[in-house]
């Protein structure tokens, strides 16, 4: 069957359980999540050269575009007003989808600011049939860094996504984990876990891992994140540790602004994607012990 990428809810819910062409190894110590390349035995079906040609044309065109202007990707990815967008607040939107032609393709996590490309994350979907592995490595080499049998995700302008919305506490330096938590690429849902396997959200896992690194100064930076889920986790921390904060009036005003910018946020309840009232959901997590 011809491979055709479609980023739908089923994929979101099953991603933690799938045994697919690429296994992801996530190291929270690095924002450069890697994809390991595996080769299976030869497929019993003959190679469809038309699919290979379609992949080659698409990946070659994308390579040329990226060499000229890394932000000029809307047309080739066929992004328009009909695409499902997640509102992050403060003029930012997120589009998570995919583009593929034959055996392979690219998952993209695109961030728009006032309708313009601000940043993105590209994840390769690489065919594991050994008969075409070398041909596809060459096709992907112009888009993704390849080293030690590993395809690395590609990021555009990620450093801007690591910055707070306001220039708050500029003397505070965040570690690599917390910088990645600031970006939408760590996941923009707010909550704890979900899906068929009950996996902890990536942003929540990082937040827990870095809990000892979070203090009032760092928390205020997190509350100013472009990432809507991270903002709410910052508010959650503040609500649980109010006595540690000195400038509560300013913080409370900012929290009101955050809620007005994003009255509702996406979460998972079991296997179901839900849109919940942001303020009410934070209040629920403030009451939780974990």
Residue ranges and their predicted role:
Residues 1-6:
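Bacterial N-terminal signal peptides that target proteins for export
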Residues 8-11:
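Hydrophobic alpha-helical targeting segments used for export or membrane insertion
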Residues 13-16:
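C-terminal motif of bacterial Sec signal peptides marking the signal peptidase cleavage site
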Residues 18-20:
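Bacterial signal peptide processing site
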Residues 22-217, 222-229, 238-241, 248-290:
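Extended repeat-based scaffolds of very large eukaryotic assembly and lipid-transport proteins
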Residues 234-235:
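Hydrophobic core positions within HEAT/HEAT-like alpha-solenoid repeats
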């Amino acid at each position: 069957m011809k491979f055709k990428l479609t980023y739908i809810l089923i994929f979101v819910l099953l991603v933690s359980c799938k045994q697919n062409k690429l296994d992801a190894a996530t190291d929270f110590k690095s924002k450069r999540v890697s994809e390991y390349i595996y080769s299976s035995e030869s497929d019993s079906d003959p190679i469809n050269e038309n699919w290979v040609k379609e992949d080659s044309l698409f990946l070659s065109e994308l390579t040329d575009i990226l060499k000229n202007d890394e932000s000029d990707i809307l047309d080739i990815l066929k992004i328009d007003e009909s695409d499902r967008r997640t509102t992050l607040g403060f003029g930012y939107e997120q589009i998570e989808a995919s583009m593929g032609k034959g055996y392979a393709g690219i998952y993209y996590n695109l961030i728009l600011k006032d309708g313009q490309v601000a940043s993105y994350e590209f994840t390769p979907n690489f065919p594991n049939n050994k008969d075409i592995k070398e041909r596809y490595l060459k096709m992907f080499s112009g888009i993704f860094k390849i080293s030690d049998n590993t395809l690395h995700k590609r990021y555009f302008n990620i450093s801007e996504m690591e910055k707070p919305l306001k220039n708050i506490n500029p003397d505070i330096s965040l570690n690599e984990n917390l910088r990645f938590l600031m970006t939408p690429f760590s996941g923009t849902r707010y909550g704890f876990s979900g899906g068929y396997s009950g996996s902890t959200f990536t942003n929540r896992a990082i937040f827990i891992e870095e809990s000892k690194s979070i203090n009032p100064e760092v928390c205020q930076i997190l509350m100013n994140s472009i990432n809507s889920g991270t903002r709410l986790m910052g508010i959650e921390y503040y609500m649980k540790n109010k006595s540690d904060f000195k400038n509560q009036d300013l913080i409370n005003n900012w929290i009101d602004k955050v809620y007005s910018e994003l009255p509702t946020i996406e979460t998972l309840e079991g296997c179901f994607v839900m849109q919940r009232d942001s303020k009410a959901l934070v209040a629920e997590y403030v009451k939780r012990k974990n």
